[in-house]
């Protein structure tokens, strides 16, 4: 069932959206739209479990990530928009750096009752690898028509500072931090 939900979510991004405000606005400027006009949503969900936030309540605790191919198709479509100048305002999601992160053992995740996978400490079952996200960033930045992409979504620094038992994951977190700066 979860695989079907993930598939439906991924497919929903490939529908023929216009990327324009509702016609009822008839050419009026919408400041909030200006901010997201050239942004790309990479995933849904958040495992932060913050008491003040409702993201996990309406998007879920488990991250559902889009495929690299789907993301690149959307970015290519943006580059063909008449007023696109080469700058993506956001490659992100509810928390930008949770893309493709999940528990190593899904059975443990399904049984878990913790509201947060990262507080008060990062769950040892959580794979905090930033390499899939770095791969997306590099692929997007290499596309013709892209001058620069930004991360406008919130970043969980606790994930960047977390020391994994895997040195490659720690290197990827440092590389991601350099990418942000």
Where are these regions (language model features)?
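Short, well-ordered alpha-helical packing segments
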Residues: 13, 47, 54, 72-79, ...
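Flexible loop/turn segments at secondary-structure boundaries
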Residues: 5, 19, 47-49, 59-62, ...
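Flexible, acidic/Gly-rich N-terminal and inter-domain linker regions that tether
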Residues: 1-36
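Iron-sulfur (Fe-S) cluster-binding segments and ferredoxin-like electron-carrier domains
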Residues: 53-70
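Short, flexible loop/turn elements at secondary-structure junctions
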Residues: 16, 42-46, 54, 92-95, ...
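Amphipathic alpha-helical segments in well-structured domains
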Residues: 68-72, 130-133
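Conserved SAM/AdoMet-binding glycine-rich loop
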Residues: 77-181
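N-terminal pre-triad scaffold of radical SAM enzymes
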Residues: 27-54, 72, 84-87, 181
């Amino acid at each position: 069932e979860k695989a079907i939900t993930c598939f439906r979510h991924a497919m929903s991004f490939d529908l023929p959206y216009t990327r324009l405000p509702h016609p009822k606005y008839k050419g009026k400027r919408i400041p909030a739209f200006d901010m997201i006009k050239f942004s790309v949503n990479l995933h849904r969900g958040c495992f932060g479990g913050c008491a003040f936030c409702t993201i996990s309540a309406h998007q879920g605790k488990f991250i559902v990530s889009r495929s690299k191919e789907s993301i690149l198709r959307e970015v290519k479509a943006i580059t063909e928009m008449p007023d696109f100048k080469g700058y993506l305002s956001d490659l992100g999601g509810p928390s930008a750096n949770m893309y493709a992160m999940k528990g190593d053992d899904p059975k443990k995740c399904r049984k878990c009752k913790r509201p947060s996978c990262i507080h008060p400490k990062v769950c040892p079952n959580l794979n905090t690898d930033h390499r899939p996200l770095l791969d997306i960033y590099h692929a997007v930045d290499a596309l013709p028509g892209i001058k620069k992409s930004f991360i406008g979504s919130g970043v969980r620094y606790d994930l960047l500072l977390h020391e994994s038992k895997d040195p490659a994951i720690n290197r990827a977190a440092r590389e991601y931090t350099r990418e942000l700066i």
